[in-house]
Amino acid sequence: MSNSSSVSEFLLLAFADTRELQLLHFALFLGIYLAALLGNGLILTAVACDHHLHTPMYFFLLNLALLDQACISTTVPKAMANALWDTRTISYQGCAAQVLFFVFLVGAEYSILTIMAYDRYVAICKPLHYGSLLGSRACAQMAAAAWGSGFLYSILHTANTFSLPLCRGNVLDQFFCEIPDILKLSCSDAYLREAALLVVSFCLAFACFVFISFSYVQIFRAMLRMPSEQDQRKAFSTCLPHLAVVSLTLSTALVAYLKPPSISSPSLDMVVSFLYSVVPPAVNPLIYSMRNQELKHALWKLIGYMLLLHQ
């Protein structure tokens, strides 16, 4: 990273030019951030405290909630601070840390979502083997592999990005540090690295998508063979939240990274980045708690217990 020592800080894209709009954006981000912390925090606490939820499905949901909570905490607090204090700066080290943690958490989240599809596949297509295929040790190993692969992926891409010399200014057209925007500041021809980065990321996301799609093809075939409509409805209700979360996560990421350059602009890029980096972590707890009766019951029991403690 010594090649980039001439850059000591970066300037992030401001949300608005006027002070009133900056404060409005601060209030908006604060509301979304608190909602995400509350939603994911409730899921974490409910799954950890309710022994009825100590199953593989909820173990992976706990991992997802933890990743969502950490992911939104990587980008939003700095954006809120900049809007509140009317500044745009982030230190070089802070930017590197933001890239490292964001890529790590997003990569691990895609892996967890893929594992959750496998969990639903085994539960519906191979119910008699569920205990042996998804025992406590197997679940812990899969979760560790997801977190570990995300961290390795992040280390490689962060080191690749910040090893480049930067001499095209220090202004990033984004409200947080993203690798494509940093590569645009490189003195060297970074197009090959940027293309390789896009290809690797796309291949990994596509591999997750193919595995998830294959799992759900098998799941839907198994559901159609179920004799009872009630069993079909119950099986579908356990899959619907995961399908919704996967659709939201992958669709927003694809729009962000595969949109045509001809329609790209700083304002549009910022909106798209907001959609894929802020919206899923805030909305995922709502998606999972809407149709899941077990989780709703555990959440209401937890809320009732908390209210009782404050009386």
Give residue ranges: language-model regions.
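Transmembrane helical core of 7TM receptor-like proteins
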Residues: 1-311
